[in-house]
């Protein structure tokens, strides 16, 4: 049978999602726990790989197993074997044609940014940080230039392995919650470092260093060198994919409520 799992994790201690020789990744920790619980080697696929330091609120994975167990037993059993900063939120049986990556309609991320004269301490690793005040209207005007289908080469990491730089950015919402800003992104897919590179540009505009129209110039240049530096990974959260209703999978977890 094929199982889909929703997984949340704090990415601070890990070298990203994808398995590495060091085995200090979220995928490695999850597969070790699942393999021990299932008493057979479990290999997983995920909806979207995250970099070192990036957090996940609802990463979706799938794997195949000959075992027929109740979904809750997979949740409780796997969590008993996982480190405290990784948790399985839910488990669902899915048809064999379901694929956590290929079946996704879109992917969602949030970036949480603290605006404060003092760097974060209690929230260290959980939020990005800027000590200069930001102008919301200017950032929203700049963000509007990125909506729709574009070549996002200017926001692409040099190591990006995507076959095409053309992506459809469906949503980029900017809101303020006390001392924190929340930037929420939704697209069919994202390039490597795309969100962090966009964040660097939005903050540049928000601080008044560049006008909102500058972001359109950066986009059209299709040249990474004209954009702002890549922003910190600390405040980036993978909110998870969206799927068509017929798959019967959740589109959020209780972890969503803990973000500003």
From Swiss-Prot:
<dbReference type="Pfam" id="PF01416">
    <property type="entry name" value="PseudoU_synth_1"/>
</dbReference>
<keyword id="KW-0413">Isomerase</keyword>
<comment type="subunit">
    <text>Homodimer.</text>
</comment>
<feature type="binding site">
    <location>
        <position position="109"/>
    </location>
    <ligand>
        <name>substrate</name>
    </ligand>
</feature>
<dbReference type="InterPro" id="IPR020095">
    <property type="entry name" value="PsdUridine_synth_TruA_C"/>
</dbReference>
<feature type="active site" description="Nucleophile">
    <location>
        <position position="51"/>
    </location>
</feature>
<keyword id="KW-0819">tRNA processing</keyword>
<dbReference type="GO" id="GO:0003723">
    <property type="term" value="F:RNA binding"/>
</dbReference>
<dbReference type="InterPro" id="IPR001406">
    <property type="entry name" value="PsdUridine_synth_TruA"/>
</dbReference>
<dbReference type="InterPro" id="IPR020103">
    <property type="entry name" value="PsdUridine_synth_cat_dom_sf"/>
</dbReference>
<dbReference type="InterPro" id="IPR020097">
    <property type="entry name" value="PsdUridine_synth_TruA_a/b_dom"/>
</dbReference>
<dbReference type="GO" id="GO:0031119">
    <property type="term" value="P:tRNA pseudouridine synthesis"/>
</dbReference>
<protein>
    <recommendedName>
        <fullName>tRNA pseudouridine synthase A</fullName>
        <ecNumber>5.4.99.12</ecNumber>
    </recommendedName>
</protein>
<dbReference type="InterPro" id="IPR020094">
    <property type="entry name" value="TruA/RsuA/RluB/E/F_N"/>
</dbReference>
<comment type="function">
    <text>Formation of pseudouridine at positions 38, 39 and 40 in the anticodon stem and loop of transfer RNAs.</text>
</comment>
<comment type="similarity">
    <text>Belongs to the tRNA pseudouridine synthase TruA family.</text>
</comment>
<dbReference type="GO" id="GO:0160147">
    <property type="term" value="F:tRNA pseudouridine(38-40) synthase activity"/>
</dbReference>
């Amino acid at each position: 049978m094929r199982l889909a799992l929703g997984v949340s994790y704090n990415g601070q201690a890990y070298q990203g999602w994808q398995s590495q020789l060091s085995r200090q990744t979220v995928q490695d920790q999850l597969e070790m726990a699942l393999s021990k619980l299932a008493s057979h080697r479990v290999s997983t696929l995920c909806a979207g790989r995250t970099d070192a330091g990036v957090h996940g609120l609802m990463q979706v994975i799938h794997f195949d197993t000959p075992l027929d167990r109740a979904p809750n037993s997979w949740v409780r059993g796997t969590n008993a074997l996982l480190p405290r900063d990784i948790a399985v939120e839910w488990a669902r049986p899915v048809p064999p044609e379901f694929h956590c990556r290929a079946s996704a309609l879109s992917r969602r991320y949030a970036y949480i940014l603290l605006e404060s004269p003092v760097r974060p301490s209690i929230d260290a690793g959980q939020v990005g940080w800027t000590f200069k005040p930001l102008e919301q209207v200017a950032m929203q005007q700049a963000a509007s230039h990125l909506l729709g289908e574009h070549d996002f080469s200017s926001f692409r990491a040099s190591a990006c392995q995507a076959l095409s730089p053309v992506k459809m950015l469906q949503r980029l919402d900017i809101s303020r919650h006390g001392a924190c800003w929340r930037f929420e992104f939704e697209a069919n897919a994202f390039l490597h470092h795309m969100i962090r590179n966009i964040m660097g540009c939005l903050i540049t505009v928000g601080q008044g260093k560049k006008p909102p129209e500058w972001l359109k110039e950066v986009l059209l240049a299709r040249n990474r060198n004209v954009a702002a530096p890549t922003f910190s990974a600390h405040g980036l959260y993978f909110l998870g994919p969206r799927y068509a209703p017929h798959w019967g999978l959740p589109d959020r977890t209780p972890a969503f409520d803990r973000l500003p």
